[in-house]
Structure formats: structure tokens, C-alpha cells
């Protein structure tokens, strides 16, 4: 069964090289939706994933409802297993063939893949080297918040083989029935990681593109309105982050990271 990943992007030239090099090894096909990028994002997509599609979004403002409508329209064009991820989100499993085989074995049409929020530890950052494109990003950071109870906050993304995902805005809920995929397979969401000037600039550029509805939903507080506000938020979240190398499920996913 065909495996397709779909993703919107806007000025993602910092994370896209890692994201594309990671996911082109897992998925047969990718549909990348450009929301008016003015940097090298499109060029990077064509360079690192020349066999994937790059399309222009018909929505230049960032609006969660319109984004999900557009995504579901595209999902209806393809068959097989489908997943929709943001550029911050990296799907990880031990063995791709075994993972997709297990989806058939379990007999469901939709699965929730648990999400780990990657957040650097401000007391540990001096031990991290500057991120390099020659090494997978998922192998360069190992601090985050593990979804011990993923039902709190719906800490997951969906993979499914329905006509479309029947998502509610934000894509953490679906009108389809689904089960949580419990084997060591996760979405690593680089939320406040790697925490550097490039990541700050990436977050701050999104706020001015929010639609009126996005502002009413309070998304400007999610992406930040100044570097100072982001640094305060990072300090708060950094106190919650854990060294994932001590987590047994994470160890199964990344055995090289055992402390």
C-alpha cells in the first residue's frame, strides 16, 4: 500500500533539509504545500526531494481551519496510508517495513502516533553541539516531554487510509474512530529545540501571517510576538523537559542514546 506524507510549509529553509532527508527514507510520496515562501524553501524541496510534488497553497494567511480543509482535499487524491505533519514534526520508528506491516496486522484504518515535545534543557545546552545537516536532527537532541498520558492534550498525529482524515481544526482530533499506536513509534516535534536564533526567527515570522480567525484563537501567543517573550516561554518549558535517554520506550527507538 502506498505511503504518502503531506505538509504545508512557509519559509522553512532552516528545518526543511533535516525534515526532507528524514522522511524521504520512509515515505513513497510527498506532497509539499508552499504557503507563499520567500526564502529558499521551494528550492530545497526540489533539490532534496525531486521526486515529490511541490504545490502552491491557495491560502497565504495561516488559518488552521483552511489549512486542514486544503490538506483533506489533497488526501482525497491519494490512496494508501497518509500522514500530515508540520515541518517541526519528525515521524520515527525502528523499522519502516515492520511498522507499516503492523498497521495491517492490527486491522484499524486510523492510528494516533504519540508525540514527544522536544524542548532543550537550558542547563544542558552547553553540552549540545551546533546542529549539523550531516547528522539527522533526531540524533542531535534528546531532551523533551514524553507523552505518558497522550490523551491529555491529544499529544499525537494521525496516520490513516481513509478517503480523508475528517480532522477537526489542528488535526489532533478526528471524526473517524482510531486507536493509539502503542509500540515504540513517535512523532518528535521540535517545539523549543534546537533553541537558537534560527528557531526563534522561525516562530516569530509566523505570527504576522495569522488570519483574523487565527488571532482570535490566540495563536499569536503560541508562536510568540517578540524574542523576549519566547525566551521567557522557553525558560518555563525547559523546567519540564526530561532527558529522554532514561525512558525505556525512547531507548528502544534510539538505542544509541542509552546514558
Question: Where do the protein language model's features map onto the residues?
Answer:
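Short beta-strand/loop segment that forms part of the nucleotide-sugar
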Residues: 28-36, 57
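A structural signal for isolated positions on well-ordered beta-strands in alpha/beta enzyme cores
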Residues: 4-6, 30-31, 53
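Active-site beta-to-alpha loop of glycosyltransferases that engages the nucleotide-sugar donor
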Residues: 2-21, 36
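Active-site-proximal specificity loops/subdomain of glycosyltransferases
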Residues: 18, 40-85
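Conserved acidic residues
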Residues: 28, 80, 88, 109
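Active-site acidic Asp-centered loop
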Residues: 35, 85-87
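Catalytic-site signature of metal-activated, phosphate-bearing donor transferases
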Residues: 64-73, 92-259
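Gly/Ala-rich phosphate-binding loop of Rossmann-like dinucleotide-binding domains
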Residues: 24
Amino acid at each position: 500500500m502506498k505511503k504518502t506524507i503531506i505538509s504545508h510549509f512557509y519559509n522553512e529553509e532552516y528545518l526543511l533539509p533535516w525534515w526532507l532527508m528524514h522522511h524521504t527514507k520512509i515515505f513513497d510520496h510527498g506532497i509539499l504545500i508552499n504557503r507563499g515562501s520567500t526564502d529558499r524553501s521551494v528550492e530545497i524541496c526540489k533539490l532534496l526531494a525531486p521526486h515529490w510534488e511541490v504545490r502552491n497553497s491557495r491560502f497565504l494567511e495561516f488559518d488552521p481551519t483552511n489549512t486542514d480543509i486544503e490538506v483533506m482535499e489533497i488526501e482525497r487524491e491519494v490512496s494508501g496510508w497518509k500522514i500530515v505533519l508540520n515541518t517541526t514534526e519528525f515521524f520515527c520508528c525502528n523499522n519502516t517495513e515492520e511498522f507499516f506491516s503492523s498497521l495491517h496486522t492490527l486491522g484499524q484504518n486510523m492510528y494516533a502516533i504519540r508525540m514527544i515535545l522536544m524542548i532543550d534543557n537550558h542547563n544542558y545546552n552547553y553540552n549540545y553541539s551546533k546542529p549539523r545537516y550531516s547528522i539527522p536532527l533526531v540524533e542531535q537532541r534528546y531532551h523533551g516531554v514524553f507523552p505518558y498520558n497522550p490523551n491529555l492534550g491529544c499529544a499525537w498525529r494521525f496516520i490513516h487510509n481513509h478517503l480523508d482524515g475528517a480532522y477537526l481544526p489542528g488535526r489532533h482530533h478526528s471524526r473517524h474512530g482510531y486507536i493509539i499506536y502503542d509500540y515504540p513509534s513517535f512523532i518528535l516535534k521540535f517545539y523549543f529545540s534546537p533553541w537558537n536564533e534560527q528557531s526563534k526567527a522561525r516562530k516569530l515570522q509566523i505570527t504576522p501571517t495569522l488570519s483574523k480567525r487565527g488571532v482570535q484563537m490566540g495563536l499569536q501567543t503560541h508562536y510568540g510576538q517578540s524574542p523576549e517573550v519566547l525566551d521567557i516561554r522557553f525558560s518555563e518549558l525547559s523546567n519540564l523537559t526530561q532527558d529522554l535517554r532514561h525512558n525505556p520506550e525512547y531507548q528502544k527507538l534510539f538505542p544509541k542514546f542509552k546514558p
